[in-house]
Amino acid sequence: MISPLSVIILAAGKGTRMQSAKPKVLQTLAGKSLLGHVLDTCHQLTVDDTIIVHGFGGEQVQAHIAEQYAHLPITWVAQTEQLGTGHAVKVTLSDLPKEGQSLILYGDVPLVSCQTLATLQAANIYGVSMLTLTVDNPFGLGRIKRDKAGNIEAIIEQKDASSDEQQIQEINSGIYCVDNALLHKFLPKLSNDNAQQEYYLTDIVKMAVADGITIAAIEPEHTFEIEGVNNRQQLASLERTWQGKLVADLQEAGVQFADPTRVDIRGTLSVGQDVFVDVGVVFEGDCTLGDNVYIEAGCVIKNSQIGNACHIKPYCVIDEATVGAGVDIGPFAHLRPETVLSDNSKVGNFVEIKKSTIGHGSKVNHLSYIGDATVGTGVNVGAGVITCNYDGVNKSQTIIEDHAFIGSNSSLVAPVTIGDTATIAAGSVITKDVDASALAFGRARQTQKDNFQRPTKK
């Protein structure tokens, strides 16, 4: 029988060195809060209870999680005094089940992997397992003290370590998997009789050893998995490390980056073969790229699906759009939510499309706004065409049927339908439906005054 798993996330720190009114765990890395990373990772496991210990900015933290993770049942526990990590876990005891085991994690250590946590959980055979790492420079970190047989005896904090103990290079990450029964047994016994006058969570290791419990230790695959964030520099460094990992994974999947250090992935990116990504491209949310997609510099793509063989030219913004195969976009195009571009369509420079469908092979090449519209197959939309979809209160639909031709600088005042193969003369204001195959004019007749004299200065 699998032991029930609780997750305790310590998220009470203020993060003074961040110089921010926002709690540290709400700072963002790769477009997601630090705490959000931890929640997403641990809930890839089978978790029975989630307890978050909050402190500074607790209302902000709870509001953020309620908005982003409404589907997760979370127990919130306040740590009103910052008395150390041991005290932070201790305040959860009234909500922590007596049975099962708990992963103890940190809201400012965002990149521990699901695989590492699963291995840590599996290693907890005797009651306590912990994540450790051997580093070149252990200064400031808790040292793992082992006996002659190699068994863990204790964790010694930097300020309490002797000169010999300070030479130890194996350090404590602070991440544990502990039987709940042992937490209920050991945490009430913690003392703050140390240099920091804090209640150290690390003391439960010493207590477990005194009870004859063998402490299991594993190391993460990547050093960055245990790196915490205390200031802006560390946050920026961890951001670049994580982006490097994401880019490397995509390169292994066949993506070519013009410069792997100049791309940001702030979510999940699924890719086909032979994708090219130029410099300065940002992916946000859940994005999918088909085969042979070519994305030029400076584009922002958010929660969108891009079909095979699409070419996205520089500085386009694509937000919650679905793009078919063989589509050309940009430069400087803006696709807003609920835009659908069918196969082989084209959207050119300085075109904005919102909540509209552009049919197969249709073109909107220049300086146009298409909103709340359905555009059929083989339609040509000339430069400067505007669908006037808003009357100040309501949005209305524009329908342009197959093979229609919309002349430049025309305004289509919705609700309006342009029939199959209809032609709209340039400069028209169309306020009524246009029949199939008709030519519609909606402008004043041209007037010419011969020998006109311009005004002159007096």
From Swiss-Prot:
Region (N-acetyltransferase): 254-458
Keywords, alphabetical: Acyltransferase, Cell shape, Cell wall biogenesis/degradation, Cytoplasm, Magnesium, Metal-binding, Multifunctional enzyme, Nucleotidyltransferase, Peptidoglycan synthesis, Repeat, Transferase
Cofactor comment text: Binds 1 Mg(2+) ion per subunit.
Residue ranges of the region described as Linker: 233-253
Enzyme class: transferase
Binding site for UDP-N-acetyl-alpha-D-glucosamine: 10-13, 24, 79, 84-85, 106-108, 142, 157, 172, 230, 336, 354, 369, 380
Name assigned to this protein: Bifunctional protein GlmU
Organism of origin: Psychrobacter arcticus (strain DSM 17307 / VKM B-2377 / 273-4)
